[in-house]
Amino acid sequence: MIENKPAKVLFKTIMPVLLLITLVISFDLFFPPIALSDLSYNNVMYKILTDFFDVIILIPFFVFCLSKHLFRFTTHRRCLVFLLLFLSLVFLLLILYNFSLVNVYAAFYYLIVIAFFEEITFRGYMFTVLNQHFSFNKSVVISGIVFGFSHGLYSFLLFGTSIFSVLNFIGGGIIGSYIFSFIYVKTKSLVFPIYFHALLDFCGFVLF
């Protein structure tokens, strides 16, 4: 069913996400995050605390989404359970491939701080709500634009990247949105896009 007032739907759906992103960026501007490549035993507690508060910011949003029954974490099919176990094994092997404090923390970071946060926000909430009013493709593109824009804005404000790089992030955000939304729709669970998202980021960090 197509919504008669798409602009109103977009506004009501996008604004909570922009508010959430604004809170995260504001916190990280006051307490600059430590890059994983700079992590050491001397600063690991600071890294844990700042990442912890980034996750805390998500909790009210997460509870709201659960109260509306917007998404599920279940894995009913046996083959999906085996896939989940396989992805967990890949995570473990990547950590053991080059065992270090940085890689162990990176596995946690990409799974909980990055993938869990982003998939709940952009797939569990934003894509799900949009897809109740718009087609799959429109929902993917809209959520992907916001997904990429938030990454580009974060990178620009905290790491000083070019403002034009935001366009690259938006393009990548749309591609990522297609991949993760497709997995979400096919599995009917956020578990798999979260795991796959984290695995892609973690592989990129460990191998490249």
What is the meaning of each model-derived region?
Residues M1-H69, F202-F208:
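N-terminal, membrane-interfacial amphipathic/helix-forming hydrophobic leader that caps
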Residues K5, V9, L39-N43, K47, ...:
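Membrane-helix interfacial "entry" motifs
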Residues T13-I25, D51-I59, L83-L87, V140, ...:
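Alpha-helical transmembrane spans of integral membrane proteins, capturing the lipid-embedded, hydrophobic core
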Residues F27-D38, L92-V102, G152-G160:
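Juxtamembrane "helix-exit" motif on the non-cytosolic side of transmembrane helices
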Residues S67-T74, L157-I163:
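Membrane-interface interhelical linkers
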Residues T75-L84, A106, N137-K138:
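Cytoplasmic-side transmembrane-helix entry/capping segments in multi-pass membrane proteins
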Residues L89-L92, L111:
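Transmembrane beta-strand segments that form the barrel wall of outer-membrane beta-barrel proteins
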Residues L101-F208:
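Transmembrane helix-loop-helix hairpins at the membrane interface
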